[in-house]
Amino acid sequence: MAWQAPQSVKPSQSSATSDPAPIADSKVNRPIADYRYPEGQTFTYGVDWRLLTAGTTVVHFDTVNGERHVVVTADSTGAVALLYHVHDKLETFFNPQSNCALQLIKHTEEGFRRVETSVRYDYHALKAVLDERNIRAKNQKHEENDIPPCVTNTVSAALYVGSQPLQQGTKFRFPSSDGGKAADIEVTVEGREKVKTPSGSYNTIRVSAEALNGPQKGKGKVWIWYSDDQKRMAVQMRLRAFWGTIVFHLAQIRSGA
């Protein structure tokens, strides 16, 4: 499931703090020994916004040439699709031993926006190399932004968190970049909870996450309920922003291509 920060704006925030110093204890750690990546599986999520069924998100997991490969598609449906068209596809590769993101590819269709984005993580140069093409505006941009020796991104971050110890009451921080300067994300392991979704009932570990710096600071908060087992499946996710709350419920799990 994509860990996409809500897009809200707070008037009190100033661009003068857009380049904060990185937080010293923010780092990406290796997965715990008994974590099980959902190889070859496809998760389908129903998406609700306020009282409406808003769309569907599908996530497929596999491994390509020794690299973890995750593909996410998100589509608005029903009345919400009439109000606001969404057809997004996000694809990432990351290292299974280190959890470091290697590449991110995004196709964005949101409202009238049509954007193609490619991000390559160059850990030798400590740069995120971004190339973006705005199809409607017919312009392109190329950026190279500083990153630490290992980062996650909007897709791999949710998997990264699930691969960690998740001891109740603890907090940890990690850097994430979708091609821009890395932001530090703080995760709080809030507790255990029984959750029922269309795919079944689960004993879960609930965590919350929010950006400590960067462009998404103060613009929303994310909660994820992970299955309390070796799989650490994201069975439910809630994103809260000024325009409301979006909830993802795990509806179906399929194995195979």
Region annotations inferred by a language model:
Residues 115-161:
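Hydrophobic, well-structured mid-protein blocks that either form specific transmembrane helices
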Residues 3-123, 160-257:
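Acidic, serine/threonine-rich low-complexity disordered tracts
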